[in-house]
Amino acid sequence: MACQSSYLHIDLSADLLVPDFGEKVIEINVASLKKLGILLSGRGSNFEAIAGSITSGRLRAEIAIVISNRADAPGLESARRRGLNAVLIPSKGRIREEHDSEVVAALKQAQVDLVCLAGYMRLLSADFVRAFSNQIVNIHPSLLPAFPGMDAQKQALEYGVKVTGCTVHFVDEHLDHGPIILQKTVPVLDGDDAHSLSARILAQEHIAYSEAIGLVLSGEVEVQDRKVVRKPARAEAK
């Protein structure tokens, strides 16, 4: 099953972690843009990074809907402040398949082209994954297949690796397992603890997620078995 991995609490006031959203807003034809659906359960820092990339023109896409399963998710309020279609679909006390069915219906109604998990702390059912085959992406704070699941940063420190990072991958029916789209490396320093390492990984996540989304939406890559590969260049017509 798919699951968005958890993160330690990071102080987003640090300059290192805040994406630069101060660039000039680029006006583009919204009708031609691919639509994103964002799922989040918490503060949604990767959602903020994606939204900032769109505002600055670095990512050509439109956020069609932001869905949270938690009413107290700061990311949901952030989406409302941005004037986005922010939807609460509570999950507490509900059967997973029933809740997923409602989320899928909302995503379908919004006509999204790609579903992005941004701190969505729910396991996705097999029906959900099948409804958006190779159209759901997740970001995980390790170089998969190393250190899947919870507390990936702590796992990396305890194992003693010298390099870790983050991975953007398609979601399949297994945890942190789908085909890898893009990875970025982060060195593990001698004085690192889980918080300092998490902070540096998160800074790279903010870059990597938008890059990977742009790559997928460009149509230049495809999934072959477990591999995400670039499509062959078309021969020019004579």
Predicted regions, residues:
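One-carbon transfer enzymes
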Residues: C3-K238
